[in-house]
Amino acid sequence: MKLGIVESAYMRYGISEGAKKAKEHGFECYDFGRFIDTETEFFKLPEEEFKAELTRIRELVQAEGITVWQAHAPWRFPPRDATPEDRAERLLDMRKAVRGASYLGAKHFIIHALMPFGSHSPDNPELMRDINAEFMAELAKEAVAYGVEHINVENLPFPGLPLNYTEQCLEFVKRMNKETSSDIFKVCIDTGHSNACGESPADAVRMLGKEYLGALHVHDNDGTRDTHWLPGEGTIDWEDFSNALAEIGFEGCMSFETEVPNSVPLGVERDRREIELAEIGKKIIKRI
């Protein structure tokens, strides 16, 4: 099992210097989050410039021993997925992000379900699932074409949605693999989302098993809010989570979707806190 973290935790130092520091602290992989906001100058770059910049990032971080393991899909809130036109526009951005993941060398693409009826419980849950199935099937074609191995459907912190809990995501992923005659779809467990919705992240891991657990977003909270705290600051049972990963033989990346707070200035104290976070990660994946 590998140890990863969001790239924003170390990009503040510069691409090469940040990757070097991440590696020195004990991390091996990045979770790339710069595709989330599609309104940035970066995301709006023409395709060739977009590809060149991401290829440059990949080469620089790889030179320091860091692999971009996974990339997060575009995400906007409040959601704007209500009309076919909204979803067509979103699909264009998603396809570009999948290509971006490919340019980075990332094999895992992590996506939230579309919310065509908002983040509350829809009147027609089956229609929501069908809309997502049609959308995801189209996105899978781009992933296959560009060598991105898995689209990971992430559990969410919106209890009313029919694609929120781990079990719901699992059933959807099984449906998508059947409909696409593939095994491209897996589930990303977000530990904070699970905890905020009353699910045990460890039990979610056991439910999916090695076959369906593709990626992880690891962080903590108080069981009610999606606060992205560091592990140990909230109520998640990390020993049970660690044991669950070992039980199923997970071989992917245990990736933190959290980082040392921005309030901690650069220097000795921040280095100490970042190393501590890596040590927590090593304990979870049972390296120490």
Regions found by a protein language model. Give the residues of each.
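Hydrophobic, aromatic-enriched interface-forming segments
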Residues: 148-164
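Secondary-structure boundary elements
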Residues: 103, 141-150, 178-179
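Structural motif corresponding to the early beta-alpha repeats
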Residues: 28-134, 260-261
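Active-site-proximal loop/turn and secondary-structure-junction residues that shape catalytic pockets
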Residues: 9-11, 34-36, 74-77, 113-117, ...
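A generic structural signal for short
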Residues: 6-7, 44-46, 85-86, 127-128, ...
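Histidine-acidic metal/acid-base catalytic patches
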Residues: 1-4, 12-28, 62, 91, ...
